[in-house]
Amino acid sequence: PVCERSIASTSQMLDPRTGQWSREVLTAYGLKENHFAPLVASGTVTGTLTTGAKIIAVAGHDTQCASAAMPCAEEDVEHTAFLSCGTWSLLGTELDTPILTADSCQSGLSNELGANGKINYLKNIIGLWLIQESRREYKRRGQAYSFAELEQQALAAEPLRSFIDPDAPEFVAPGDLPGRIQEFCRRTGQPIPETMGAVMRCIYESLALKYRYAIEQLSAVTGRTFTTLHVLGG
């Protein structure tokens, strides 16, 4: 058995500078390197099937697979950011070397190894979980709608009326997210989104603003100016 580096880097036990297990972290937890499978790069041939077909280690982290397919010329990398948008949203850019500064840590930015040996420098944001879980709650109440129907209701609602912080702790657990969104708006002195469309609009616009904020953080720490954002699926 082997462990592909991109998925290993999400464990927080990999040193992004060396691409190897961090002895400092392992020692702190009483672990040894031989507790883990040997590390390999994505694309490594690790064996063959009885039919002769090669067994190849792919990028085990789905976001790294998605970002590897990003249509970006080498000369445009420094001005390009990506947003892998699913239940979670991961917004970042590609670097040659990790950034391990205090500003980086305080901004909640992480260094994950990509499928091509580069660093995917990114921020984790709660994403379409807010839509998914709100839809489940409305269905539980007897109001079953498709995602397309929810989008249409959001489009029909008044814009730029109420906002939430998608990463606020009260939105992490399953349950009555529409009710929690209304309570957040009540607590922060904003208009309360009463209808389903208003709740959906609040979520979509809040995510858009959170993505903008993350891009500004990314730009401040890296010193880069981003002119292109590729939206991907992980």
Model segments located where?
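Active-site core segments that coordinate phosphate-bearing ligands/cofactors
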Residues: P1-V2, I7, Q12-A28, T50-L229
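A conserved helix-loop-beta module that forms one wall/lid of the active-site cleft
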Residues: R23-T44
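Glycine-rich phosphate-binding loops at beta-strand->alpha-helix junctions
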Residues: A41-T48, F226-G234
